[in-house]
Amino acid sequence: YHKLKKVLPIIVNKNSWIKPQFVIERVLTKLKENDNLPALLYVFSRKKCNEIAKQISIGLFEEDSKTPAIIRKEAINILRKMPNFKELMILPEYEEIMRLNEKGIAVHHSGISKPFREMQEILFKKGYYKLLVATETMGVGVDMPVRTVIYMSLLKFDGNTFRYVHPHEYAQQAGRAGRRGRDTKGRVI
């Protein structure tokens, strides 16, 4: 406490803060080393979900993993069942999603086109992703259990003002950690 008390004014005065990308990548590296992936990263803004996912520069698969190629092939097979398959494949959103998917990252929020959101839900359930960056809509209704739940913040905008996540919301969201029948415990960061 005393060391922090001395250092904090220096950090504030010099406007020196650790970048969220650095913290997220360090946390993900530790989770990967300790076999605590897949993880769900809650971000309470669609725009921030996309930004954070794009900023993650580390790959979450093993170096010689064939999973990125499998993801692309599986994604095409899923989308091929859609009537507008060819149109979906040429959208910039598709390539953006695939770039993230091939690093083991998926983004899930209401701003993602429904076919791509459903595709990522299927691929997540098959175990292809290591990180799901999502808004709180992921906490309700979609069954995608993970080993670890990470919060970027416990503050969220409720339409009028910023407030802390209510206990029942936290319990619902954090309850994703620990896969029933597979994990003895879940982690919340």
What feature does the model see in each segment?
Residues 2-9, 25-28, 42, 46-131, ...:
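Conserved C-terminal RecA-like helicase domain
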Residues 17-33:
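Short linear interaction motifs
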Residues 34-37, 103:
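Inter-lobe coupling/hinge region of RecA-like P-loop helicase motors
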Residues 38-40, 131, 187:
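Residue-level preference for the first positions of well-ordered beta-strands
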Residues 46-49, 112-113, 138-140, 155-157, ...:
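Conserved nucleotide-binding/hydrolysis micro-motifs of P-loop NTPases
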Residues 135:
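H-loop/switch region of ABC-family ATPase nucleotide-binding domains
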Residues 144, 148-189:
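Conserved segment of the helicase C-terminal RecA-like domain
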